[in-house]
Amino acid sequence: EPIEEDRFVGGDIYEVVQSPYGTRVIIGDVQGKGLPAIGAGFAAIAAFREAAVREPTLTGVVEALEDAVVRHNVFSAQTGEAERFVTALILGFDEGGDVQAVNCGHLPPRLLHEGRASAVPLDRTSVPLGLAGLSRESRAEESFALPPEATLLVVTDGVTEARDAARDFYPFDQRLGDWAGHGPRELLDALHVDLEKFTGGVRRDDVAALALRRAPGDGRPRPTAAAEEARPVAGAVSD
């Protein structure tokens, strides 16, 4: 139930796709701002929408994303624009209780379950999209459990790097501990209100947040998203 239909928010991107291989999700952050960043974001989103339903493996989806960002950068260089990279977390949900993940330099997801909140330990974090040529290691898929009634929260660094008037960082994980019993929509609403209060309404980066919970019975995740450009909405904000 996305609150905002636009899946590209300033420098942040997110999308949820139902595929023959299960539900696939991306959340990401494009380096930089302005029209060049928007172009790289659109390239990544378009590639994800196609590859998510075509590629049987999550690493295949990520390879398609890498190719798309690299092609975009080649075109950008020819037109005198700076090259861009994209941090991204790509998730796959099947009929079982596990989640597959490929982390391309993005923040790890947070798991809220049974009154506790914790970061999901992902050990194979790789370089951002567009930079695979600089790494000797290939990207690898990991998996972790998503128990029934648990909520998985993924955000961009506009949340974790938000600052107050004293230049202190937003205490993201501390707040999640206070909200560990919330459902997806209630969680995003609380995050939005608290970010507004903490920053005094002054933010210097885009913000996107996506809360996912498996729908009862079919094993598929039910996403709740919040993201908007320039002004706040219930759940998350973006500047």
Question: What do the predicted segments below correspond to?
Answer:
Residues 1-7, 107-144, 169, 230-239:
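PP2C/PPM family metal-dependent serine/threonine protein phosphatase catalytic domain
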Residues 13-15, 90, 143:
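Short, surface-exposed charged micro-motifs
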Residues 39-116, 121, 127, 138-139, ...:
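Catalytic core of PPM/PP2C metal-dependent serine/threonine phosphatase domains
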Residues 37-51, 125, 143-202, 218-235:
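Active-site-proximal, acidic helix/loop segment immediately C-terminal to a metal-coordinating Asp/Glu
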Residues 1-27:
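N-terminal entry segment of metal-dependent catalytic domains or homologous docking segments
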